[in-house]
Amino acid sequence: MGAPILASAAHAVPALETGGHAMDASITSRETKGGRRLWYRMRVIQQPERARACGSGPKSSADRRPVDPPPVVELRIYEGQTWDQAQEKDITFVYNANFFLFATLEHARIMAHARGSASSANTPPVLTGMPVSGMAYLDRPEEAGYFLFPDLSVRHEGRYKLTFNLYEETKEDKDKDKERDVESQPPLTGLSPATGGSFDFRMEVKSQDFIVYSAKKFPGLAESTALSRVVAEQGCRVRIRRDVRMRRRDGKGAGDYDNGEEEYNRRRRTATPDNRNNDFAARARSMSGSTERTPYSADPQRRPSMADYPSQYAQNPPAGGHLQFLGGNASSQYPAAPPQPFAQPPSVPASPVYPPTQAAPYQMQTSYPPPPPPPAPKRERTPSQSGYAPINPAPRRESIHHDYRPSGPIQLPPLPPPPYYPPTPQQSHMPPPQPPQVLPPLQIDSNSKSNNRLPMPSPTALANSAPRPLASLAPLAPLMQSTSSSAGKGPVHPATLPPPAVYAGAKRAHDESFWSEPEHGRYQNGTRDKGRSEDIITDPTSMPFRRADGTEADGIRLRY
């Protein structure tokens, strides 16, 4: 086997195409048994530039991080006694032989180690993939033989270079080596012993240094080169990337291993915006959302209205607005009083505050609207629009009470208090009749029906909400009695009422705040009224009621 002959003046081989890194070539020659001299010229026409370390884990053997771009080695064979003569006769395509190229990996710089420590220089870096390539005869870019390495991966990061070793299997005896030196390398045993073939080492060529990056520092794969495309178009298996896949990251690149020589000029350095501060701000806002919802919870809206009851009953309620929404009959039971000095919180100014003994009928009407026509519930729910002042409203509405105070009789003669006042919504009296201008629409009937479940008049009878003469409105007095929850036959003097502050700070049951069912009856003068549910339908007689002067009279019964 002929020893490799490098380009030198002794062999009349000039320095050929050594200007560029892709044109560096290694040339050798040998003499065959037939007396011919063959010249081998091999060069790396596509140098590797970068790679990503594929690691050394259990699955690293299946991890493919190919060197980019894939190395391409060109081989040409010439025949001639001298190099000048050989360049005129290229026999690459006509020479009958098999060639393969074996790639090995080595460090670009020699690593120094401390004394006494095991030298790891003898441990070669791990190269995975397909390090062997057969020669492909291609017409482009030039007619020559090409070795492609599209599947070479490196496990560890660092700076490396590839060494390509050329082996030849001769097919004809005349092309074998003329004489073999004893000190020369023996031929490799062929893969097919039956044929007696063998592989002879011809030459080697080294690539330029390239960098293997870690996964964190890898700049990404570049677009496939024109040479890779040309080779792939001719049937070779080379991966083609038509889009740039370079990473946009800010960090160190080739400066880690190039010793300050050159940088990878295609790497793009673009700082990625840091969004960690935005995440912290978003979490802070989400955490503060619970505190923002606290002032709008249900408890702060209900508690101030309940706490207003004790201060409202510190003085007598105003006479003009206590029960005017019930028809004005009960509005004359209390003498006029100065406005309340308390200040109601702003969370409940929209809904007027009612005393516990009298607010039940009004709240019952708003919670359970009765079937009468729309005008009655509308005026009932908005007493300020129907011409009647609300019961104990906020201080800003107290002027309304005094404005409507002259609309009906104000003073009542003081009467003896009833013997018993249970702490229930029945603490009221039978309201005396009032002049027509202060009687409310017939929403009182709807309230009594919703509380006592009595049949109500037809909508045509209740449609007229204008004030009526006293004779026509007299039968409504018993209905007022049912809604006002009287505890005695006569009006109750305000001085004798127990302080209703006991209901201000606690929740009450529905039966304590609203009308009890008809089967339970009502207390009047210490006895339970049994005949209230039949007043309208079953009782054919006249309807007695008590006037303001204390006398009883029979009213005209409504027929429907």
From Swiss-Prot:
Biased composition (Low complexity): 461-479
Superkingdom of this protein's organism: Eukaryota
Motif (Nuclear localization signal): 49-54
Compositional bias (Polar residues): 444-453
Region Disordered: start-end pairs: 49-70, 171-197, 250-560
Upper classification of the organism: Eukaryota, Fungi, Dikarya, Ascomycota, Pezizomycotina
Annotated region described as PEST, given as residue ranges: 455-496
This protein's encoding gene: veA
Family listed: Belongs to the velvet family. VeA subfamily.
Main location: nucleus
Assembly information from the UniProt record: Component of the heterotrimeric velvet complex composed of laeA, veA and velB; VeA acting as a bridging protein between laeA and velB.
Matching InterPro entries: Velvet (IPR021740), Velvet_dom (IPR037525), Velvet_dom_sf (IPR038491)
Domain Velvet residues, every copy: 35-241
Gene Ontology cellular component terms for the protein in this record: cytoplasm; nucleus
Induction (record text): Expression under light condition is higher than that under dark condition. Expressed almost constitutively at an increased level throughout the asexual and sexual developmental processes.
Biased composition (Pro residues): 336-355, 411-439
Keywords annotated in UniProt: Cytoplasm, Nucleus, Sporulation, Transcription, Transcription regulation
Domain notes per entry: The C-terminal PEST domain is a region rich in proline, glutamic acid, serine and threonine residues that is required for the light-dependent regulation of development and secondary metabolism.
Biased composition (Basic and acidic residues): 171-183, 395-405, 508-535, 546-560
Pfam annotation, one family: Velvet
Location relative to the cell: Nucleus; Cytoplasm
Function: Component of the velvet transcription factor complex that controls sexual/asexual developmental ratio in response to light, promoting sexual development in the darkness while stimulating asexual sporulation under illumination. The velvet complex acts as a global regulator for secondary metabolite gene expression. Positively regulates chaetoglobosin A biosynthesis by controlling the expression of core genes of the chaetoglobosin A biosynthetic gene cluster and other relevant regulators in a light-dependent manner.
GO biological process: sporulation resulting in formation of a cellular spore
Disruption phenotype: Decreases the production of chaetoglobosin A.
Name of this protein: Developmental and secondary metabolism regulator veA
